[in-house]
């Protein structure tokens, strides 16, 4: 080490001087050389003690580091000091030879600087200077914009308003766009000022401007989200089910004025509109009944009050549920091509044979049963007209006037002819091949023979157990409209269903006096009629054989036949 070298030189010089004076062993030249060296060292100020302290303190000074916290006013100042992708803070670290830890979002805006004392002091001065510079720039910018009126708002310009447009948190960046291009475009197009929400705040855009411009900006924001995400934002939380098409409240149905089973399946009138706050995704969402287990009334039954070809195409497999069927006459001519007219009250009327509104059926309306009235295994009550009551074994009860013939099969048009497009859900048994079953959840519409039927509209043949189900009596006056019905006991169809009588005995129990013979075989009793012509001149076997032909037609009028129905008289 230099300090030890200088100390040895000093000790040797003093010792040599003493020896020279005492013994005279050293020459004068050596003493002069040593003295000259000591003088040079003394001129430099590096004697033995000072040199030792200087060289010993230097490594200790290099190893000492310090850490200091430098606060700034806000997180905006932090962003300004750090710079884009940290370019400014990297340059400051290299300039001051320090390590500067930047604060993360959500923490206090404090920089932590580590390094030598003078380097830390330099970095601290740079950070504070940059923060003050940014504060001055922001203050002057706010002052100039406030004087120029560039920041619109209710306090500055009269007539302007501010609204809040709430969007999902995940689409905030979508609305802002790359480098704010989308939100700037919306501001320029609508002449509004839009404040973008911060990351740690609610996803609400504050739009300021004239009322019409504010509305335009809101629509632009929602349209942009819809364009990029494929949907429209629901403004209220209660419309989530409506937006997804998975539920429908009972308010639409009960709003039509109906109550009970009929109103649950009724189609809303045009006066019923969706909630104002709702922005529907689809045009077929006005009356979705998916939560009730049936198809949408709007989608499959006309889609409004005007019939259309597309709606007729969709009617092949859909029909209203049985509890809402009431074959009543009403003035609504909203015919959907399936023989029914659906009204707000949950009723259905059968159109005239030629589809003209002036030839509507003239039978009396059949009101819906009261709540709590049995729907299955019920019998008709005795009507005020004096007609006897009788059980009817079919999918629905007839409320139409009977024909003038001795048989009491009924067609809504009256007489011996039936409408060609009427859905005869009353006393109808579809022609099916033996052993086949195709249950449906709703009454059959006009279809090809054998396409399927309601699970209650079971085919009733003259075999044991063929006694069918008795549906509810939809009117008290039905007995008067079915002349010649044989009085029965009060047990109704439940007794007939539990009986194990043979086919001949069960069919003979339904016969009445003066019955006719089949016009084909002239052996069996006339118990069947053909659809749609309505000629009731055949037994069930002959009627089935007619329908099972390759080109079935009525032997009387040579009209194409779709099915055979059994007459209960």
Curated annotation (Swiss-Prot):
A Pfam family the protein falls into:
KH_1
Where on the chain is Phosphoserine found, per UniProt? Answer: 4, 288, 462
- What molecular functions are annotated in GO for this chain? calcium ion binding; RNA binding; zinc ion binding
**Domain KH residues, every copy:** 66-127, 160-221
Gene Ontology CC entries for this record: cytosol; nucleoplasm; P-body
Give compartment(s). Answer: Nucleus; Cytoplasm; Cytoplasm, P-body; Cytoplasmic granule
State where composition is biased (Low complexity): 491-509
- PTM annotation, UniProt: Phosphorylation at Ser-462 creates a docking site for 14-3-3, which stabilizes the protein and modulates its ability to bind RNA.
Q: Principal localization? A: nucleus
- InterPro entries xrefs: KH-I_MEX3_rpt1, KH-I_MEX3_rpt2, KH_dom, KH_dom_type_1, KH_dom_type_1_sf, MEX3, Znf_RING, Znf_RING/FYVE/PHD
Ranges annotated as biased composition (Gly residues): 13-26
What remark about domains does the record contain? Binds RNA through its KH domains.
Give the keywords, sorted.
Cytoplasm, Metal-binding, Nucleus, Phosphoprotein, Repeat, RNA-binding, Zinc, Zinc-finger
Q: In which tissues is it expressed?
A: Highest levels found in fetal brain and testis. Detected in the adult intestinal epithelium, specifically in goblet cell at protein level.
Region span, Disordered: 1-31, 252-296, 338-365, 482-514
Key word Signal present in the record? no
Biological source species? Homo sapiens
PROSITE patterns, A to Z: KH_TYPE_1, ZF_RING_2
Q: What is this protein called?
A: RNA-binding protein MEX3B
Under PANTHER family, the record lists: RING FINGER AND KH DOMAIN CONTAINING PROTEIN 1 (PTHR23285), RNA-BINDING PROTEIN MEX3B (PTHR23285:SF5)
Q: What does this protein do?
A: RNA-binding protein. May be involved in post-transcriptional regulatory mechanisms.
Zn-finger segments (RING-type): 518-558
Annotated GO biological processes are: protein autophosphorylation; protein phosphorylation
Coiled-coil regions, chain positions: none
